[in-house]
Amino acid sequence: MKKIAITCALLSSLVASSVWADAASDLKSRLDKVSSFHASFTQKVTDGSGAAVQEGQGDLWVKRPNLFNWHMTQPDESILVSDGKTLWFYNPFVEQATATWLKDATGNTPFMLIARNQSSDWQQYNIKQNGDDFVLTPKASNGNLKQFTINVGRDGTIHQFSAVEQDDQRSSYQLKSQQNGAVDAAKFTFTPPQGVTVDDQRK
């Protein structure tokens, strides 16, 4: 009986690993179908009890693997731009911009996962699939991300994604009007406006 139990446990583990691998492969394959796009989005943040913390909206431009522009317009404007090497974060309200090397930025965030779509990133997660929904749970428990969910169609269109942090705060993003196709290269460049304080952390 003990040998049977061990065999069943091993088979169960192998089946689970195969399912996770298939889900990761399907997710990457779907995202690979769209190399660049623009979409508007709405954001809703809730705390562990489900109470609303913040609602917002903005626009998103992506050209994989490393070019993106995340422009939050409400409730407070902020801009996150990657030119492929430098990651810029600009807060117009405080007139401050921060520059860091993209290679040093954490990949353990939903947006970075979507923008890069690299196999090495997806391998850090156990992934379960239910139709167009993919639920990702980090294999390592030392990060702030508890769970990441993304809904992406077979044509590569992202409909929504959400992230749950360790304190159960949930950030949900609904994408709409996704336009697949070439994006103006100017969207992936950033020059700090005159008078803005720059914190350059690339040194």
From Swiss-Prot:
Main location: periplasm
Disulfide bond is among the record's keywords: no
Annotated compartments: Periplasm
UniProt keyword Chaperone present: yes
Keywords assigned: Chaperone, Periplasm, Protein transport, Signal, Transport
Summary of the function given for this chain in its UniProt record: Participates in the translocation of lipoproteins from the inner membrane to the outer membrane. Only forms a complex with a lipoprotein if the residue after the N-terminal Cys is not an aspartate (The Asp acts as a targeting signal to indicate that the lipoprotein should stay in the inner membrane); the inner membrane retention signal functions at the release step.
Record note on quaternary structure: Monomer.
Family membership: Belongs to the LolA family.
Protein name: Outer-membrane lipoprotein carrier protein
Organism phylogeny: Bacteria, Pseudomonadati, Pseudomonadota, Gammaproteobacteria, Enterobacterales
